[in-house]
A protein has these predicted regions:
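Flavin-dependent oxidoreductase catalytic cores
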Residues: 1-71, 75, 80-91, 99, ...
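Repeat-solenoid scaffold signature
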Residues: 1-13, 123-138, 144-145
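N-terminal glycine-rich dinucleotide-binding loop that anchors FAD/FMN and/or NAD(P) in oxidoreductases
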Residues: 18-24, 106-135, 165-180
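Hydrophobic, well-ordered secondary-structure elements that form the walls
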Residues: 40, 127, 216
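Rossmann-like dinucleotide/flavin-binding elements
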Residues: 62-93, 135-147, 158-171, 179-228
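Glycine-rich phosphate-binding loop signature in dinucleotide/nucleotide-binding domains
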Residues: 148-152
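N-terminal Rossmann-like NAD(P) cofactor-binding module of classical short-chain dehydrogenase/reductase
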Residues: 155
Length: 228
């Protein structure tokens, strides 16, 4: 398994909860199509084992243990926390929202993306078994909070947002009229409503255009999906 090279052993040892399940995002296939090194959403060490000496699950113990803060509990923040904790550091994860998982949790609620919650599920299970990790929700972090905590290092993993500026892979100038009633992907995921027929212009060429189209259609909207 690309997502978990130790899948057979974990099944044999009845460690099902430790399996990093494939989420079916096909970024591995996309890597091959674009002739770039293999990538995997669940296994960031893939294709780097020999080049960088990265192991999928074993992290060398740090010579000096530190108190560390990870601001943000999305996929990147949880992965950073897990690697740092496995190295033996004391890790605090602070998430400003009421849920841990960030983008993977939000997008897993869209039609067809339920498996994407596995990105957070695997990491949260591992972190919750570790005595050197604290997880906090409803905890927005700013410079003053970092100073008060007196940690050795802070890792900022506060995420990104889908653009809503009319630009895309093939559009280097804004699409004319995009500002008239346009909604960002983030707004739609968070429940924003749009009256009347909806046109989705997909200049990402991956998954989100199709997913948002299906999501809005299931809500009863008249949807037209357009690609370059």
């Amino acid at each position: 398994s690309i997502a978990d090279p130790y899948l057979p052993n974990k099944i044999r040892e009845n460690r099902v909860e430790d399996i990093r399940e494939c989420i079916g995002c096909n970024i591995c296939v996309s890597s091959d199509a674009f002739s770039i090194p293999l990538n995997c959403t669940q296994n960031p060490t893939i294709s780097q084992e020999w080049k960088r000496g990265w192991h999928p699950e074993i992290v060398p113990s740090a010579a000096s243990k530190k108190d560390l803060l990870v601001a943000g509990a999305g996929p990147a923040g949880l992965e950073a926390a897990l690697v740092l904790a496995r190295a033996g550091h004391r890790v605090t994860v602070a998430e400003k929202s009421s849920e841990l998982g960030g983008r993977s949790l939000l997008e897993s609620r869209l039609f067809g993306l339920g498996a994407w919650s596995r990105v957070a599920d695997y990491r949260l299970y591992q972190l919750r078994q570790m005595a050197n990790v604290d997880l906090y929700t409803d905890s927005e972090i700013d410079a003053d909070a970092v100073s008060e905590m007196e940690v050795d290092h802070t890792f900022v993993a506060t995420g990104a947002h889908w653009l809503n500026n009319g630009l895309g892979r093939t559009h280097f100038d804004p699409i004319e009229g995009f500002e008239q009633g346009s909604l960002s992907v983030d707004a739609i995921i968070n429940g924003a409503k749009q009256d009347g027929p909806i046109v989705i212009y997909d200049d990402e060429h991956y998954y989100m255009g199709n997913v948002i189209a299906a999501h809005l259609a299931r809500l009863g909207n008249d949807v037209t999906l357009v690609t370059p």
